Swiss-Prot record:
One of its GO terms (biological process) is diterpenoid biosynthetic process. A motif (DDXXD motif) lies at residues 352-356. Catalyzes the synthesis of the semivolatile diterpene rhizatalene A. This is Terpenoid synthase 8. It comes from Arabidopsis thaliana (Mouse-ear cress). It catalyses: (2E,6E,10E)-geranylgeranyl diphosphate = rhizathalene A + diphosphate. Mg(2+) 2 binds at residues 352, 356. The gene is TPS08. Binds 3 Mg(2+) or Mn(2+) ions per subunit.
C-alpha cells in the first residue's frame, strides 16, 4: 500500500488484522507525536478476501462497487489551465464589484438586489460576500420606502427571496397586494411565468405562520405546471420551471443551482455576456478543483482495500461521499476541507452499513462499546476480522483528522466531533436492539432514537470540524444544546429517510421505520401515513426557515450549514433513496458536476 503523503505515516494502518490479532488500544487524541516520525515500511495490502465465517448465514443486501469509484483515481488536471482561469476571473471581479457598490438610491438598490440574485443563482456570490452584505443591509433598512409603489411580482418576490436567504426577515405582507377582494391570488398574474416562478421560489422560505406564503406555494405550483405543459413558455423557460418544481433553488445544492441556471441564463435574450462568461469560467475552475480532490480521495479509499477486508454489505461510494461534501461548501477555498469531509462521510456510511445491514447484535454491541471507550472492549479480540477492521479504520480516520487540524490549533473541533459521533454510534446500536426484538415501538419512542441515528447533528459536527475557525468552541456548545433549529432538521432528515427508503426496508424485512410506527400508532394505511409524514416534513422545513432567521447570535455561515445538511437530504431523498440506489438523479448530478464539460 502506497504511503499517504498528506499525513504523517505514524498513524496509518501498519498492522495486518487477522482474526487472532490482539488490538492494542490506540488512544485518541495522540499526545506523544514525535516531530519526525520513524520511517516505517508498509506492507502492501492483501488482495485475498478475508471472509467472515458467518457471512453465508446472514441475510444482507450485497452492494456492487459504484461505477464511479475507478473513474477519477488517475485523472490529470492541468495546473496551468487553472492558473489561466483564475487570471481571467480576477480581471472580471473588479467590474462586478463596481456595479454592486454603485450609486445610492432606492431604484439603484433594487437593481443591485436583483443582481445579487443573479450572482447567487450563477454560483458567483462567494466572490462578493462583503459587498453583498452591505448592499442588503442598505436594502433592508429602507425596505418600506423601496417597496412603496412597487407592483412588479418578479421584483418583489426576488427581493424577498434574497433578503430572507441572507437572514433578513422581510415581511410577507407585501404579497397581499397580489390578492383580490375574494382573498385569493388575482387571476391576472397566473400567466406571468417569471413572476410566478419567483413567487414560488420565495414561498420556499416561508415560516410556520405565514399562511399567505402557503397559499402562494399552492397557487404558483398549479399554475406553473400548466404553463410548463401547454407551450406558452419558451422551451428553456419551461425546462427551468420543471426543474424548480422538482426541487426549488432553496432546497437544491448551490452548485447544482448554478449548473442549471447557467444553461437557462445563456438562453435568455437579455443576458449579460460578461456575467455569463464569468459564471462559466468560475464553474470550470470549480470543476477542476473537484477532479483534483476526487483523485486524492479515491486513492485514499483504495489504499484501505475495503473489498478485501469487508463482506459486500458496504456501499462503495467514495465519489458520492465527495459529491455530498460539495453540498456543504462548494467554493474552491474549501478544497482541502472537502477531502477531509468526504473521509468523515465514509466513516458515517461504514458505521451505518455495519450496524444496520450486517453486524449481529453482539458484534454491534462490541463495536459500540469499543468506540465509546475509544479502545477495544473485552469482546473485540474474539470478533471477526471485518469488525476489527471497521473499528481500526474509524479510529485511524479520527487520528488523521487530529493530525491535520492540530496544526491549525483546532484539536477541540476533532474532540467535539468525536463526542457527537459517539451519540450516533449509540443510536445505531439502539436501532439494532429494536430490530432484534421485532417489537414495533410507538412513533414517539422511535423518533427519540431515529432522530439521532439519521445523523444530522453528527454530519453538522463534521461540517464544522472541516470548515475552519468559524466553527469555534462556542458553536459546538450550541450544537450540544440541541436547539429547535437542529431538532427540526433531525426530524426532517429522519422522516425523509424513512419515506424514501420504506420499500427498500420492507424488502429486507426491516420493519422498525417511521412509516410503520406511525401506521401502527394511528391505525392508518401506508399511503395515509406517508401523506401525514410528508406534511410533517414540510412543517419542519418551515421551522428551519424560521429558526434560520431567529438565530441571530450565530454567524450566517454556521446557520447556513444546517440548511446545507437539509439540502443534501433533499438531493438524496426527493426522488427515492438516492444514496443507497444512486442510479438516477444522483448519477445525473455527478455527471453534470464532474464529467460534462462547460462550453466557454
Amino acid at each position: 500500500m502506497e504511503a499517504i503523503k498528506t499525513f504523517s505515516p505514524k498513524f496509518g494502518f501498519q498492522i495486518s488484522l487477522s482474526p487472532r490479532t490482539h488490538l492494542t488500544p490506540v488512544r485518541f487524541p495522540p499526545t506523544a507525536c514525535p516531530v519526525k516520525p520513524a520511517n516505517l515500511v508498509r506492507l502492501k495490502a492483501t488482495r485475498a478476501l478475508i471472509r467472515d465465517p458467518q457471512e453465508s448465514n446472514r441475510k444482507f443486501q450485497k452492494f456492487p462497487p459504484s461505477e464511479w469509484t475507478n473513474r477519477f483515481d488517475s485523472v490529470s488536471v492541468d495546473a496551468s489551465e487553472m492558473d489561466a482561469l483564475r487570471k481571467e476571473i480576477d480581471k472580471i471581479i473588479p467590474n462586478v464589484k463596481k456595479e454592486l457598490m454603485s450609486s445610492q438610491g432606492i431604484e439603484s438598490t433594487k437593481k443591485k438586489i436583483l443582481m445579487v440574485y443573479l450572482l447567487v443563482s450563477l454560483g458567483l456570490a462567494y466572490h462578493f460576500e462583503d459587498e453583498i452584505e452591505e448592499c442588503l443591509k442598505e436594502g433592508f433598512e429602507t425596505i418600506e420606502e423601496m417597496m412603496a409603489g412597487e407592483d412588479n411580482l418578479y421584483t418583489i418576490s426576488i427581493i424577498f427571496l434574497v433578503l430572507r436567504t441572507y437572514g433578513h426577515h422581510m415581511s410577507s405582507d407585501i404579497f397581499q397586494k397580489f390578492k383580490g377582494n375574494d382573498g385569493n391570488f388575482k387571476g391576472c398574474i397566473s400567466g406571468d411565468a417569471k413572476g410566478l416562478l419567483a413567487l414560488y421560489e420565495a414561498a420556499q422560505l416561508r415560516t410556520t405562520t405565514e399562511y399567505i406564503m402557503e397559499e402562494a406555494l399552492s397557487f404558483t405550483s398549479s399554475n406553473l405546471e400548466l404553463l410548463a405543459a401547454d407551450g406558452r413558455c419558451p422551451p428553456h423557460l419551461s425546462k427551468h420551471i420543471r426543474n424548480a418544481l422538482g426541487l426549488s433553488q432553496h432546497k437544491q445544492m448551490e452548485v447544482l443551482v448554478a449548473v442549471e441556471y447557467i444553461s437557462f441564463y445563456e438562453q435568455e435574450k437579455d443576458h449579460d455576456k460578461i456575467l455569463l462568461k464569468f459564471a462559466k469560467l468560475n464553474f470550470k475552475l470549480m470543476q477542476l478543483h473537484y477532479l483534483e480532490e476526487l483523485k486524492v480521495v479515491t486513492k485514499w479509499y483504495k489504499e484501505h482495500d475495503f473489498a478485501s477486508n469487508l463482506p459486500p454489505y458496504f456501499k462503495y461510494v467514495i465519489v458520492e461521499n465527495h459529491f455530498f461534501a460539495i453540498t456543504m461548501y462548494f467554493e474552491p477555498k474549501f478544497s482541502q476541507k472537502r477531502i477531509m469531509l468526504a473521509k468523515y462521510f465514509t466513516v458515517l456510511v461504514l458505521l451505518d452499513d455495519t450496524c444496520d445491514r450486517y453486524a449481529s447484535l453482539s458484534e454491534a454491541e462490541s463495536l459500540t462499546n469499543s468506540l465509546e471507550r475509544w479502545a477495544p472492549d473485552d469482546a473485540m479480540d474474539k470478533q471477526p476480522h471485518y469488525l476489527k477492521f471497521v473499528f481500526k479504520f474509524i479510529m485511524g480516520c479520527f487520528e488523521e483528522f487530529e493530525r491535520e487540524l492540530a496544526s491549525e490549533g483546532r484539536s477541540y473541533s476533532v474532540k467535539a466531533t468525536l463526542e457527537e459521533f459517539k451519540t450516533i454510534v449509540k443510536a445505531n446500536f439502539d436501532f439494532a436492539k429494536l430490530a432484534h426484538t421485532g417489537h414495533v415501538p410507538s412513533f414517539k419512542e422511535y423518533m427519540e432514537v431515529g432522530e439521532v441515528e439519521v445523523g444530522v447533528c453528527a454530519t453538522l459536527a463534521g461540517n464544522l470540524m472541516c470548515i475552519g475557525h468559524i466553527g469555534d468552541e462556542g458553536v459546538y456548545e450550541w450544537l450540544k444544546s440541541r436547539p429547535k433549529f437542529l431538532k427540526a432538521a433531525s426530524t426532517y432528515g429522519r422522516l425523509m429517510n424513512d419515506i424514501a427508503g420504506f420499500e427498500d426496508d420492507m424488502k429486507r424485512e426491516y420493519v422498525i421505520t417511521g412509516v410503520n410506527t406511525y401506521m401502527k400508532q394511528y391505525g392508518l394505511t401506508k399511503m395515509e401515513a406517508i401523506r401525514e409524514l410528508q406534511n410533517l416534513v414540510e412543517y419542519n422545513h418551515t421551522i428551519m426557515n424560521e429558526e434560520f432567521l431567529k438565530t441571530t447570535d450565530l454567524p450566517r455561515q454556521i446557520r447556513k450549514q444546517v440548511i446545507n445538511v437539509a439540502r443534501s437530504l433533499n438531493v438524496s431523498y426527493t426522488e427515492g433513496e438516492g444514496f443507497t440506489h444512486t442510479k438516477g438523479k444522483v448519477d445525473e448530478y455527478i455527471t453534470s458536476l464532474f464529467i460534462t464539460p462547460i462550453r466557454i
